[in-house]
Amino acid sequence: MRTEYCGQINLSHVGQQVTLCGWVNRRRDLGSLIFIDMRDREGIVQVFFDPDRQEAFTLASELRNEFCIQIVGTVRARDEKNKNGDMATGEIEIFATELTIINRSEPLPLDSNHINSEEARLKYRYLDLRRPDMANRLKTRAKITSFVRRFMDDQGFLDIETPMLTKATPEGARDYLVPSRVHKGKFYALPQSPQLFKQLLMMSGFDRYYQIVKCFRDEDLRADRQPEFTQIDVETSFMTAPQVREVMERLVRELWQDVKSVDLGAFPSMTFAEAMRRYGSDKPDLRNPMELVDVADLLKNVEFKVFSGPANDVKGRVAALRVPGGAALSRKQIDDYAKFIETYGAKGLAYIKVNERAKGIEGITSPVAKFLNAEIVESILQRTAAADGDLIFFGADSAKVVADALGALRLKLGRDLNITNGSVWAPLWVLDFPMFEDDGEDGLTAMHHPFTAPKEMSPEQLKNAPETAIANAYDMVINGYEVGGGSVRIHNGQMQQTVFGILGITEQEQREKFGFLLDALKFGTPPHAGLAFGLDRLVMLLTGTDNIRDVIAFPKTTAAACLMTEAPNFANPASLTELGIEVVKKAKDRPSEND
């Protein structure tokens, strides 16, 4: 039906007859001429109708926005004065000789000239996707997946599919369950990741595996989370952690070069402990130069228990955050930031405004100055490298609260005060995570997942001191987003059972939930390691949006609902009966007597 795409016509086509298919993006009737901007997935081209072609001209008078049409016409070069530098096709236009209205359109429920609510955009997603910026994001996504496949194929990786209907295993989030009609009372789980299957593939001898795969997690959503998401899943045998990181870093560097023409350079690395100490985050945004600076040793003896208490507590921390130019902040702005960090458990936000650095304590303004002497103030100013016009915020609490609160404040200040350099890319590797973390109930939980190997520990050493274990794990972070995470896996049955035991999984539960894995580990398992990238996050970064729903064709809301199809919905009672399922309403869901 077409010979060219609208957005691909240029001066080389001048004089040629073309057939185009697409939509009316805009129509202008000048009386003697009718102009339309015609749009398809590749872009927009100007088409004009002349009364000399009476049939086409008369039909063109009926055109309205979003009519689906086909035109036949001749490509002409525009006069110099009529060229449009804002359009990729602005040097040419089409003189239409034939017009077919394929389908008419009712007035759109979306306004192309204004910002529509996200609810309206998701309800009419098929119309929202007609917008060039949305179409371009999905085209970029397709380009990314094509690039990844070529790269992985060139590196000798095999694209192998793993099951969608599998067994529920504890991986940190709730599973989406699928009832079995054949096996009454039993359920499949949709995979949170292909983790165990890709490890089993290593045991099968497929030493380089990858897959671009859907994963499912029934968890509370955020701007960068969806209940179903896509991973670039990778696993290797007989490769060390540095070797895995080298290949995956090369993939990302070449991807950025291909899509953005940007050289990311070699990725720096830092340990989890360093990242938390300096940035209050295990995924630090290095575009922001501000850092947390420990000052507890300077404040142990002050008569201000808010400082001295945490400073003398082995689990406490007192840290300072210097804000360049922050002395210009008003009291209300500071109070707003204090309220902001309450979300992270902080109870207050002490500060020092540096008016004249050379004057020491005489050159500052601070509500806590009365608790500090000149020597302490000078040490704080020196350690934080404060200058005239700066502001220093303090966090004093448990180490976790200080890291969480000041880490979040650092990011917010970076955005609010334009301290974060939005024109650069800042990738890094974060290494050496703790293997376990406190679950809040006198137990431990795996920081990554229970199949991650510890660094340089025997099963007996791990069992005796699990809280000291460092995981052989690594995360790739770009501009404050964790875009990929991986680890060396456990390939020893005794070590795997030891980890399960530390996590409180009984031997009976181990057999019930992971018997197939424990059996497989008995048969010559190779050392293996891998990584998974969040494809949606990669596309989000590469297309310059901060909302993951912008890079998924048909996403869910933050309530995990599809406004377009109205999923989820109630199941047919007959289907539930066939599955042996009865829906039991909770008391709060039942209608009251007054309803």
Curated annotation (Swiss-Prot):
Known InterPro entries for this protein?
A: Aa-tRNA-synt_II, aa-tRNA-synth_II, aa-tRNA-synth_II/BPL/LPL, Asp-tRNA-ligase_1, Asp-tRNA-ligase_1_N, Asp/Asn-tRNA-synth_IIb, AspRS_core, GAD-like_sf
Which one GO biological process term can you cite for this protein?
Answer: aspartyl-tRNA aminoacylation
Q: What class of enzyme is it?
A: ligase
Pfam families associated with the record = GAD, tRNA-synt_2, tRNA_anti-codon
- Which domain of life does the UniProt lineage start with? Bacteria
- SUPFAM superfamilies the record matches: Class II aaRS and biotin synthetases, GAD domain-like, Nucleic acid-binding proteins
Q: Which residues bind ATP?
A: 217-219, 226, 482, 534-537
Q: Where is this protein localized, as stated in its record? A: Cytoplasm
Listed EC numbers = 6.1.1.12
Name a GO CC annotation attached to this entry: cytoplasm
Reactions catalysed, semicolon-separated, are: tRNA(Asp) + L-aspartate + ATP = L-aspartyl-tRNA(Asp) + AMP + diphosphate
This protein's UniProt keywords: Aminoacyl-tRNA synthetase, ATP-binding, Cytoplasm, Ligase, Nucleotide-binding, Protein biosynthesis
Show the GO MF annotations. aspartate-tRNA ligase activity; ATP binding; nucleic acid binding
Chain spans, region Aspartate: 195-198
Q: Which residues bind L-aspartate?
A: 171, 217, 448, 489
Subunit (UniProt): Homodimer.
Q: Which family does it belong to?
A: Belongs to the class-II aminoacyl-tRNA synthetase family. Type 1 subfamily.
Question: What does the UniProt record say this protein does?
Answer: Catalyzes the attachment of L-aspartate to tRNA(Asp) in a two-step reaction: L-aspartate is first activated by ATP to form Asp-AMP and then transferred to the acceptor end of tRNA(Asp).
**UniProt protein name:** Aspartate--tRNA ligase
The organism that produces this protein has a lineage beginning with: Bacteria, Pseudomonadati, Pseudomonadota, Gammaproteobacteria, Enterobacterales
Gene name, please? aspS
